[in-house]
Amino acid sequence: MVNAAIVVSSNRPNVLEQISSLFRDGKTRSLGEQWTLVSGQLKGTFEDAKDACNRISATENVDCNCLSEATFSTKKKLVVFDMDSTLIQQECIDELAAEAGIQKEVATITSLAMNGEIDFQESLRRRVSLLQGLSVDVINKVIGKITFTPGAKQLCHCLKQMGATLVVASGGFVPMAEYVKGQLDLDYAYANVLEFSDDGKFLTGKVQGAIVDGQRKASILREKREELGLNKLETMAVGDGANDLVMMAESGLGIAFKAKPKVQLLADSKINLPSLQNALYLLGIDEQQQKKLLENKN
């Protein structure tokens, strides 16, 4: 017997009928205006159900996520987020490049890295080298342009109310990550350290210390999990790029948010709707529960 929970961004009868057909005794529960939970004992294997959900996602243009009973029912006490194009709407290095007038060159390398076509460490060094001589004042300009992803503040607030420890682990840079940490009331921020000239006025085009790549993100999640005395099922990771997949695999629930196709196929779950707050539905937190959590300002 295999028990599972399927969470889908739809309440359309034809979609729910397809999902219900995967269960022996599926129970349906509305989570809100747009999300539905169907849970119970599957007729076939978990892998078959996941494949069916991927087909439903593609043919019905919905987010259909099949989660194991253990994954769905375990409270998430540690959540690690990617930053660029996940918590915020920018890719910070692209914004720095725009200030330097080299956005096309840097964006091309960024795209190759996020699609897993070139090594992230190599791509980061190549991109940062193009920023040599850029004034450090530009960093504050970029921070001033940061816009948060819809639902990011609400998701983080609700998770904090639920007692979770929140971490941003970014392949971007420390000043931006610290700003995001402060704005979203996160507990920890990890990112790459840009090297400055001796007078502190310009970027040298180099990164100091170990690069925060996919492996380092996974290590951060693992280290924090061990510090907190948690098991894998009590953790969650959210990201959009290929370099987030190792971190997602290290977590109990990996969520690909508006991610590249390869990432969506390999992650535990996916969200393609514009708001990050939708991640709460994958935890079984319905609309009314979310409203109560958001009303609590403590």
UniProtKB/Swiss-Prot annotation:
Positions contributing to substrate binding: E91, R127, S170, G171, K217, N243
Record's keyword terms, sorted: Amino-acid biosynthesis, Hydrolase, Magnesium, Metal-binding, Serine biosynthesis
Similarity remark: Belongs to the HAD-like hydrolase superfamily. SerB family.
GO biological process: L-serine biosynthetic process; L-serine metabolic process
UniProt cofactor note: Binds 1 Mg(2+) ion per subunit.
EC numbers, comma separated: 3.1.3.3
Catalytic activity: O-phospho-L-serine + H2O = L-serine + phosphate; O-phospho-D-serine + H2O = D-serine + phosphate
Name of the molecule in the record: Probable phosphoserine phosphatase
GO cellular component: cytoplasm; cytosol
Annotated InterPro entries: HAD-like_SerB, HAD-like_sf, HAD_sf, PSP
Annotated GO MF terms: L-phosphoserine phosphatase activity; magnesium ion binding
UniProt pathway: Amino-acid biosynthesis; L-serine biosynthesis; L-serine from 3-phospho-D-glycerate: step 3/3
Cofactor: Mg(2+)
Gene3D superfamilies per the UniProt record, alphabetical: HAD superfamily/HAD-like
Active site: D82, D84
Binding residues for Mg(2+): D82, D84, D240
